[in-house]
């Protein structure tokens, strides 16, 4: 199996390095390539770089960095910039959760989404903290060992979130749906050294829907959550309402 690894924290980030070394040391008879941003590009979502050139830097040992977004990285990695055609894409391990509404902003999930767009089964994995990357690596490894039994095709993305706890404390894996966060906190305002007003985006909101069956609930209770995602934002329930409304309007 040929696996393309990417992330949004950058190619040197501890999460992607932990997963890279775990997979290499355990030798799953897989061919690996790592292509990730040259710096932290968290919350880049599905953005592509269109107005400036992209450059790939070869760091040896099949590790590459790109002066672009996570989506750029996967796009280049699959679409002809490298002599490598992966069987699947894995994005992560992210330092921090990607649950609920986070998936709309997440560069980690976006890298997996690009893999899906380009016809590859894709997985995004995040650690809900920044300490126990070995726990998330082990969860990912167990999935790889059983991948031949996993009915994952290119229309589905698996979004995995792992509690930041030792592996022996993990209770198991739950299949979940996305929860929901409250709105983000207000922006943080301050001044730069020259006295100019500057702003920082506020923290993500707390969980609003963390009921049983959600990713929030699973992680809070010591389980890794696995949420299957699809890319269809259509609000089907509203279609009939809008049809009825527009039928009575003259254009």
From Swiss-Prot:
Residues that bind a divalent metal cation: 8-9, 42, 94
EC numbers on record: 3.1.3.5
GO molecular function terms attached to this record: 3'-nucleotidase activity; 5'-nucleotidase activity; exopolyphosphatase activity; metal ion binding; nucleotide binding
Catalyzed reaction equations: a ribonucleoside 5'-phosphate + H2O = a ribonucleoside + phosphate
Pfam families: SurE
Cofactor, how bound (note): Binds 1 divalent metal cation per subunit.
Major localization class: cytoplasm
Signal peptide segment: none
Regions annotated as coiled coil: none
InterPro entries attached to this UniProt entry: SurE, SurE-like_Pase/nucleotidase, SurE-like_sf
Cofactor(s), names only, from the UniProt record: a divalent metal cation
Record localization: Cytoplasm
One cellular component (GO) term of this entry: cytoplasm
Protein name: 5'-nucleotidase SurE
Organism (species): Hydrogenovibrio crunogenus (strain DSM 25203 / XCL-2)
């Amino acid at each position: 199996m040929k696996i393309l690894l990417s992330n949004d924290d950058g190619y040197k980030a501890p999460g992607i390095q932990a997963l890279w070394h775990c997979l290499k040391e355990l030798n799953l008879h897989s061919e690996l390539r790592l292509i990730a941003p040259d710096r932290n590009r968290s919350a880049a979502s599905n953005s592509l770089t269109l107005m400036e050139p992209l450059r790939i830097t070869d760091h040896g040992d099949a590790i590459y960095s790109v002066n672009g977004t996570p989506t750029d990285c996967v796009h280049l990695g699959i679409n002809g910039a490298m002599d490598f055609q992966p069987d699947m894409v894995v994005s992560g391990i992210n330092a921090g959760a990607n649950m609920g509404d986070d998936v709309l902003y997440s560069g980690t999930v976006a890298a997996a989404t690009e893999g899906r767009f380009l016809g590859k089964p894709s997985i995004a994995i995040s650690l809900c903290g920044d300490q126990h990357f070995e726990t998330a690596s082990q969860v990912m490894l167990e999935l790889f060992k059983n991948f031949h039994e996993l009915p994952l095709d290119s229309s589905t993305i698996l979004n995995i979130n792992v509690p930041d706890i030792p592996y022996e404390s993990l209770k198991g894996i739950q299949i979940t749906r996305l929860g929901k966060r409250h709105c983000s906190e207000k922006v943080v305002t301050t001044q730069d050294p020259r006295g100019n007003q500057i702003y920082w985006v506020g923290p993500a909101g707390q969980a609003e829907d963390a009921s049983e069956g959600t990713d929030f609930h699973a992680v809070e209770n010591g389980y890794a959550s696995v949420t299957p995602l699809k890319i269809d934002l259509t609000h089907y329930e509203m279609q009939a309402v809008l049809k009825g409304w527009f039928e009575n309007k003259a254009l």
